[in-house]
Amino acid sequence: MCSSDLGNTMEGCPVKFALGLVSGKWKLRILWELNQQEVIRFNELQRRLEGISSVMLSKSLEELERARLVHREQYPEIPPRVEYSLTALGRSIDPYLRALGEWGMQAYEAIQAG
């Protein structure tokens, strides 16, 4: 399925391409939290992602927005209100996140069993 000479392009390896979109310590967790909400504001998202700095959250959200997985809506209000949600492409990751969670449970149980 993957050809190493084509790098991270879709033609080279769809798995590498997909992992490139969601790689990093926080992106999958951000996508999971956004998947649980219709829309969420920055501070609420940061509270749910215990340990993430505002700089890292901003950077990760910007990268996910550039990848067209996340939509950012800024309202012309004072104080400013910004809400984040998944795009249709972002929502399409749902079954894969759930499958990853199921695999995580199996791996956890196997590791605990020794």
Label each residue range with its predicted role.
Residues V15, L19, L97-Y108:
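Hydrophobic alpha-helical core bundles mediating ligand binding, dimerization, or RNAP-core interactions
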Residues T9-M56, E83:
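N-terminal helix-turn-helix DNA-binding core of bacterial DNA-binding proteins
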Residues P76-A99:
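Basic, amphipathic "hinge/linker" alpha-helix immediately C-terminal to the N-terminal HTH DNA-binding motif
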Residues R72:
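Short beta-strand "wing" residues that participate in macromolecule-binding interfaces
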Residues M1-S3:
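Short, small-residue-biased leader/transition segments that mark boundaries at the very start
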Residues A110-G114:
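Short, charged recognition helix plus adjacent turn
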Residues R68:
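Glycine-centered, phosphate/nucleic-acid-interacting loop/turn motifs that mediate DNA/RNA or nucleotide
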Residues L57, L61-L64:
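Basic amphipathic alpha-helical segments that dock to polyanions
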